[in-house]
Structures are given as C-alpha cells and as structure tokens.
C-alpha cells in the first residue's frame, strides 16, 4: 500500500508538471542530466534526486539528442540525429535497445551510445562511418545491417521510388542463408543473386563457360585474373546475371558485354599458387544499361578493411564447377556448398600448402573433405556473414585437386584488395562497400 501511495504521488507530480512549470526546478549542474542541444536539466519539486531534460521545441529524447526536424544527412551521416526509421525497402528498423540488437556491436547500452546517437529508439544512425545512415532490420531469422531511406542533404530531395521498383541492397537475397549444407546441392540464382556467369565467344560462333564472378556494383563484376590471363580481348567475353542454368535461359536473366577488363598488374602464377588473383569487369548491356535489381540480381557487400570472419566460420561457395576433377563436363545447374575458413597456421603446414599460402589468401574446406570448389568455379564468390551482412570474403583462386584431404580451396582475400578495387572503380555510386 505504501508503494502504491508513492507511485500515485509521483504520477500526480508528473501530471502537474504537464499543466504548469511551477512543480519543476532548474538544476545548476546540468551534467546530472547530460542534456544536449540547449536542453536544461530540471528536477521535481518534491523529488530532488530525480532529474530529466527539458528540451527546446525541435528536440526530443531522454537527452534532447533527437532532432525532430532533420530530414536529410550530411557527409556519411555520422552526425545525423533525425527520425528516419525504415530501410530503403520500407522495412522497419529494430530499436537499438531491443534484445536482438543488444548482441550486436552497436546498441543502446554501449558506454558511448549517447555520443553515437544510439538510445531507446529505432532511428537510423551511422556510428561506424559507413556510406550512409543504417539500422538493423529483421530479415527472416537474422538481424541485418541495411541502409536507410533518408537522403543526402547535398543531393536534394530524393524522389520516391515508383511502386514495385527495387534498389540495390548489397548482401540481401530472397532466400535465407543456409550454412548447414553438407556435400553441396544444386540451387537457383535467388540463393546467390550476385553470382555472375562469364562466357567466351570463339571463332565460328560457339560460346563456352569460363569462370564465375560477383556483382559488386551495378556496373562492375569482380573475378579472378587467371581466368583471363591467356586471352585478354574484352570483346570476346559475355557476362550473364540472374542465370541458374549453364546453357539455357533463366527467366529474368540479363546479358552484358564487357566494356573494360582490368587484370591485376601484380598477378603471377607459381607451380600451383596464383598471386594477386583478382580482376574487374565493367559490364554494359546492348542498350547501354548496367545491371537492374531484382529477386535474381543483387550486389554483394565488400568486406570491411582487414575484418575477415574468424577461422572456423561457415561460408557459401557457388558456381558451375565440376563435381570431380576427372569430370568431362560442367554441371548444367548452378551448385552451392558450404565450407569453413581454415587458419593460416593450419593451411601453411607442410602437408597442406606450406609457404605457397600468403596473407593475401584465405583457405576454406569442408571438415569431412567431401566437397570443395573445383575446376570451373574459379572467379566465383566465397560469401560469409560479416556484421550481419552477406559479404564477399574471397574469390575462388586455386587448390590441388578437388575435395582432397588436407588440400583446402584457396581464395583471394578480398579485404586486402579494397584499395585496388577503389582505385579503378573510384567512388562510383552503387559500390557495395
């Protein structure tokens, strides 16, 4: 009963506060509240140990940290404190203090949460200086980092998308990631919508499959230099996006010519290993367009600098590669399997690859040695979940045989080549950083 009376008295004081300011007293030491943006620290008349911020008209929040009139961001949006709270596909953001978000790197309970704009709300923020404000969005069973529907102040008001029109959202796919596949399985392109199938024209009109690749921006595909080193004529290559079958059309696929073919100037091949094995292809359709987003066509996120997943992490590989090195033909249907990242210390053991493996490479294998990338998978993606986003961690490069014990697949470590990628693509809009 005593507790109830105290609660009723406190409620009465709050009500009286809403009706007049005479029940509140200013506090000389505003640090008790941490008020921002000109907010003043006040206390209740009969409860001097309870403080709160009295905010100016355009601000709200526990510390007056939310700018209710802010509708755009400057720079990368690190200082944005507005109220946008959906991603670019209009899905609601998760609150920074929600249970699932509290397990992430950025959440409302961090010691520096106030400085980063995080709190008991679901408004878009950019605490880690990504390209623009973002938030966590519930997609299936996962909480993914998604860019927000808020425009850059310097570019003017962004027009609303027509109903049904999609935008590129790197690392997002229509089907849920499946990191528990054993032995590999045939799949459809919606499972890996960033996968690019690269073909070569021959004299006489025949066309053969060459390698895989990954769409990292609407106009650019990343692959492996060794796929093109012996034939560098860009006009002879064709790139398909949205394709599930090797030699027949998939509804919704797009076909592209190669406008630029950029091979890494430091590429070299040893007896077994390929060094600096990365290439870029600028793609353009016959009507002058780059890729258009759909359920079967999407960009893959590039990794943070030197922030690769931990060894032992399960990742996906995809391609039209052979199931065994002795097979004569490539499979007709796109195939996907799951491998685990292998540590450098293990991969550099003499019975693995020794000194052939460098820090610009990653090793990955099936723990049972039953499935692996193989001939024809070269240039394709090794995709892992990094900070909640599907990310291009590696590019299929080399290995001894296919699924041989103690001989994992070796992949170009994409995080080590971000400066090289940026030097050729620059700050082009749409790069999946």
UniProtKB/Swiss-Prot annotation:
EC number annotated for this UniProt entry: 3.4.21.73
SMART domains assigned: KR (SM00130), Tryp_SPc (SM00020)
Region entry Binds urokinase plasminogen activator surface receptor, spans: 36-59
Cellular compartment(s): Secreted
Catalytic reactions on record: Specific cleavage of Arg-|-Val bond in plasminogen to form plasmin
UniProt KW keywords: Disulfide bond, EGF-like domain, Glycoprotein, Hydrolase, Kringle, Phosphoprotein, Plasminogen activation, Protease, Secreted, Serine protease, Signal, Zymogen
Catalytic residues (positions): 226 (charge relay system), 277 (charge relay system), 378 (charge relay system)
GO CC annotations on file: cell surface; extracellular space; protein complex involved in cell-matrix adhesion; serine protease inhibitor complex; serine-type endopeptidase complex
Post-translational modification as stated in the protein's UniProt record: Phosphorylation of Ser-325 abolishes proadhesive ability but does not interfere with receptor binding. Produced as an inactive single-chain protein (pro-uPA or sc-uPA), is processed into the active disulfide-linked two-chain form of PLAU/uPA by a proteolytic event mediated, at least, by TMPRSS4.
Ways its activity is controlled: Inhibited by SERPINA5. Inhibited by SERPINE1.
Keyword Nucleotidyltransferase: no
Top-level lineage group: Eukaryota
Main localization of the protein described in the UniProt heading: secreted
Subunit structure: Found in high and low molecular mass forms. Each consists of two chains, A and B. The high molecular mass form contains a long chain A which is cleaved to yield a short chain A. Forms heterodimer with SERPINA5. Binds LRP1B; binding is followed by internalization and degradation. Interacts with MRC2. Interacts with PLAUR. In complex with SERPINE1, interacts with PLAUR/uPAR. Interacts with SORL1 and LRP1, either alone or in complex with SERPINE1; these interactions are abolished in the presence of LRPAP1/RAP. The ternary complex composed of PLAUR-PLAU-PAI1 also interacts with SORLA.
Name by which UniProt lists this protein: Urokinase-type plasminogen activator
